[in-house]
């Protein structure tokens, strides 16, 4: 369970350009049908990244703990830590922006988990643990076989004549 509760909703009605700055809400009930509302107070702090006091998603301490889980003897350089934190923040911002566009597309003023889930599944081939995809059916691009390409070329050739 994350700090935003099982299912985060963000009110999109007052924002033309969405800059994510999550505010925590207490977890609620079961993960299946509950929702939590997350307000977006403003834009990120200096340098484009959220500051630790603004509930930054990935902090240096969390990153160091993650590295220690992988290899207890490994130590990251300061520049590498900053770059990884920036990449994580950019990823979160791009996912939230795309999810907000999906919410607006379905004419909703709230960002729901299914918006984030759809973007992550389709664009990044990622799934959110703990959330079933009853509403979102798997989307797979049909791979075109060589025989299909030859048939299509023959059809195009005959229609040009």
Swiss-Prot record:
On this chain, the residues bearing Phosphothreonine are 43, 59
> What single Pfam family name could you report for this chain, choosing any that match?
TFIID_20kDa
Instruction: Report a single Gene Ontology molecular function.
Output: DNA binding
- GO CC annotation, single: transcription factor TFIID complex
Superkingdom of origin organism? Eukaryota
Q: Does the keyword Nucleus apply?
A: yes
List where in the cell it is found: Nucleus
The record's CDD domains line, in alphabetical order, gives:
HFD_TAF12
**What S-S linkages are listed for this chain?**
none
Positions carrying Phosphoserine are 51
All copies of domain Histone-fold, residue ranges? 56-128
Record field: compositional bias (Polar residues): 26-36
Please give the SUPFAM superfamilies that the UniProt record associates with this protein.
Histone-fold (SSF47113)
Q: Which family does it belong to?
A: Belongs to the TAF12 family.
Assembly, in brief, is: Component of the TFIID basal transcription factor complex, composed of TATA-box-binding protein TBP, and a number of TBP-associated factors (TAFs), including TAF1, TAF2, TAF3, TAF4, TAF5, TAF6, TAF7, TAF8, TAF9, TAF10, TAF11, TAF12 and TAF13. Component of the TATA-binding protein-free TAF complex (TFTC), the PCAF histone acetylase complex and the STAGA transcription coactivator-HAT complex. Component of the PCAF complex, at least composed of TADA2L/ADA2, TADA3L/ADA3, TAF5L/PAF65-beta, SUPT3H, TAF6L, TAF9, TAF10, TAF12 and TRRAP.
What this protein is called in its record is Transcription initiation factor TFIID subunit 12
Species of origin reads Bos taurus (Bovine)
- Gene field: TAF12
């Amino acid at each position: 369970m994350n700090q935003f509760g099982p299912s985060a909703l963000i009110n999109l009605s007052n924002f033309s350009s969405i800059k994510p700055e999550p505010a925590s809400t207490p977890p609620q009930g079961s993960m299946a049908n509950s929702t939590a509302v997350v307000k977006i107070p403003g834009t990120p702090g200096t340098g484009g990244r959220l500051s630790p006091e603004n509930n930054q998603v990935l902090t240096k301490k969390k990153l160091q703990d993650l590295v220690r889980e992988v290899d207890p003897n490994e130590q990251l350089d300061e520049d590498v830590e900053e770059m990884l934190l920036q990449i994580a923040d950019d990823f979160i911002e791009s996912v939230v922006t795309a999810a907000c566009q999906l919410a607006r597309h379905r004419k909703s003023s709230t960002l729901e988990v299914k918006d984030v889930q759809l973007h992550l599944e389709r664009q990044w081939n990622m799934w959110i643990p703990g959330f079933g995809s009853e509403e979102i059916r798997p989307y797979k691009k049909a791979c075109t076989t060589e025989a299909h390409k030859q048939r299509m070329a023959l059809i195009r050739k005959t229609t040009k004549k």
